[in-house]
Curated annotation (Swiss-Prot):
One of its GO terms (molecular function) is isocitrate dehydrogenase (NADP+) activity. The gene is icd. InterPro entries: IsoCit/isopropylmalate_DH_CS (IPR019818), Isocitrate_DH_NADP_dimer_prok (IPR004439), IsoPropMal-DH-like_dom (IPR024084). This is Isocitrate dehydrogenase [NADP]. It comes from Nostoc sp. (strain PCC 7120 / SAG 25.82 / UTEX 2576). NADP(+) binds at T104, H394, G395, T396, A397, P398, K399, H400, N407, Y446, R450.
Length: 473
């Protein structure tokens, strides 16, 4: 089956049922060490994960690690430009769950990004990025502890799909010509809304299937959270891109109010129900007026539409959601993308799960990570219905490779996500406690140590791993 790698002789495969992992007590898990500082951070991560599993389960559970290759290390073994060998793809497909360090961006043609390639090959449609603050972590924000969100980013669509042509290419010029002449010609009504002939051009596909499976997974996650965190916010720019980002929002609401009707309430529904609870005799029109402050300035047709919305909500879900019962449901709302960038800074404790498309999610997850301490502490997972890959969210930092100084927190916390995904919560909790206590005691690597006041003597990467284990208790 494999050309240059050999699986462990002990251990079992993780399988999947209805999109969820079925995990044996001794799973085989492929790992990619990673390029650059992967040589430092992976050994530290493996040591912490193994120690947590051993302590939590007293030998009843154990991970059998399976070394596979990608990036520069793969080229060293498999040959030039073999950044993502078939052996590695076969192993991840066979064993279902994998973890990896940072990977270099390939030079030359072919694969544009190894991370994107893995997501597309295995249909890992949900990029999951928790952003929470660990006490003692230096942050430029006054109250970083108020931010505790999970970004659910659609991973396989949007402009990141990579369907684009450079300026001057034959196909690009042809496409622009067809669009200008046949689909968006200048008209007296709309004027000249055309693409300049010297443009590069890309395509932004957003599908109903892709949008709804992402929102479905986000809502399922929300249902596992404490009641005060059961909220999913659909982040979009639908006010401008109505048929892509606006459709994402609409499809998200459609999924929530059909497939999860008894478990969810939309923000507008909550307003309608609350108005009725505060004033049982409120008229449909007055209820509509309260949920839409500009109601009286609307056209008669628009007024009738909102009144009908109020009537439909009360007739359909008052019995199941009224009299305060909606407060026990997962709240589904939406926010414009540029607004949410402000609100995670000014009103961070109002949000929990942020579900969004690929490009917005890339920006948003990095911005949120910066608030709580940066990408060095930012974990990530790419999850599909029959595979999951957990990863460092930072780059390879080759100038620090082999110096035993880089912060392994991102990969360690990605390992925590992996353990939680597997249902091994006890081991995950040990690591979170150990990491939190180490940071609170200023036992940190150089990237955090230099920002503390007063500065402290930094730990090596390997020493930070030892400190985490020591604080398991």
């Amino acid at each position: 089956m494999y050309n240059k790698i050999t699986p462990p002789t002990t251990g079992e495969k993780i399988t999947f049922k209805n999109g969820e992992p079925v995990v044996p007590d001794n799973p085989i898990i492929p790992f990619i060490r990673g390029d650059g500082t992967g040589i430092d951070i992976w050994p530290a991560t493996e040591k912490v994960l193994d120690a947590a599993v051993a302590k939590a389960y007293q030998g009843k559970r154990k991970i059998s690690w399976f070394k596979v290759y990608a990036g520069d290390e793969a080229c060293d073994l498999y040959g030039t430009y073999q950044y993502l060998p078939e052996d590695t793809l076969t192993a991840i497909r066979e064993y279902g769950v994998a973890i990896k360090g940072p990977l270099t961006t390939p030079v030359g043609g072919g694969i544009r990004s190894l991370n994107v390639a893995l997501r597309q090959i295995f249909d890992l449609y949900a990029c999951v990025r928790p952003c929470r603050y660990y006490a003692g972590t230096p942050s430029p924000h006054k109250n970083p502890e108020k931010l505790d969100v999970i970004v659910y980013r659609e991973n396989t669509e949007d402009i990141y799909l990579g369907i684009e042509w450079k300026q001057g290419s034959e196909i690009g010029d042809r496409l622009i010509s067809i669009l200008n002449k046949e689909l968006i010609p200048a008209t007296p009504e709309h004027g000249k809304k055309q693409i300049p002939l010297d443009s590069g051009i890309g395509i932004k596909p957003i599908s109903k299937t892709g949008s709804q499976r992402l929102v479905r997974r986000a809502i399922k996650h929300a249902l596992t959270l404490p009641k005060d965190k059961q909220q999913v916010t659909l982040v979009h720019k639908g006010n401008i891109m109505k048929y892509t980002e606006g459709a994402f929002r609409d499809w998200g609401y459609e999924l929530a109010t059909s497939e999860f009707r008894q478990e969810t309430v939309t923000e507008r529904e909550s307003w309608i129900l609350s108005n009725k609870e505060k004033n049982p005799n409120i008229s449909l029109e007055d209820n509509a007026r309260q949920i839409d402050p500009g109601f009286d300035a609307l056209t008669p047709e628009k007024k009738a539409q909102i009144v009908k919305e109020v009537e439909t909500v009360l007739n359909s879900i008052w019995e199941s959601h009224g009299n305060g019962k909606w407060k026990e449901k997962v709240l589904v709302n939406d926010r414009i993308a540029d607004s949410i960038f402000q609100q995670i800074q000014t009103r961070p404790d109002e949000y929990s799960i942020l579900a969004t498309m690929n490009l917005n999610g890339d920006y948003l997850s990095d911005a949120a990570a910066a608030i709580v301490g940066g990408l060095g502490m930012g974990p990530g997972a790419n999850i599909g219905d029959s595979c999951a890959v957990f990863e460092a969210t930072h780059g390879t930092a080759p100038k620090h490779a082999g110096l035993d100084r880089i912060n392994p927190g991102s990969v360690i916390l990605s390992g925590v996500m992996m353990l939680e995904y597997m249902g091994w919560q006890e081991a995950a909790d040990l690591i979170k406690k150990g990491l939190s206590d180490a940071i609170a005691n200023s036992q940190v690597t150089y990237d955090l140590a230099r920002l503390l006041e007063p500065p402290v003597e930094p730990l090596k990467c390997s020493e930070f791993a030892d400190a985490i284990i020591k604080h398991f208790g």
